A protein has these predicted regions:
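Pre-Walker A (Motif I) flank of P-loop NTPase domains
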Residues: 2-4
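P-loop (Walker A) phosphate-binding loop of NTP-binding proteins
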Residues: 10
Length: 105
């Protein structure tokens, strides 16, 4: 049984806000993958993009999302996660993926 929920959506669509509420309702942990990327890379996302370029950032994002190991979590990856084939396959394997849309996006 899949024990995670992953929210897929556009940047700034409200995935983190919804994710925190959903995690609380399900008694799950909330995971913001952007924060994991920053912690692992020891740089802010904007610094990674400035130094590595868009393609370099996408490679890092794909690698980190494809390596996530967790149970009982609501996962909010960045909006560009959909460009990482390995990441998307892994997220489908470890979670129920939901497409979140919002008028705010």
């Amino acid at each position: 049984m899949k024990t995670n929920v992953t929210l897929i959506g556009m940047p700034a669509s409200g995935k983190s806000t919804l994710g925190q509420r959903l995690a609380e309702a399900l008694d799950f942990e909330f995971v913001d993958v952007d924060r994991i990327i920053e912690a692992e890379e020891k740089r802010l996302l904007k610094e990674i993009i400035a130094q590595e370029g868009d393609d370099g950032f996408l490679e890092i994002e794909n690698r980190i999302n494809a390596a996530l190991k967790m149970d009982g979590c609501v996962i909010a990856p960045g909006g560009s996660v959909i460009y990482g084939a390995e990441a998307m396959e892994h997220l489908r394997d470890i979670s129920i993926c939901l497409l979140y849309t919002s008028d705010a996006a």
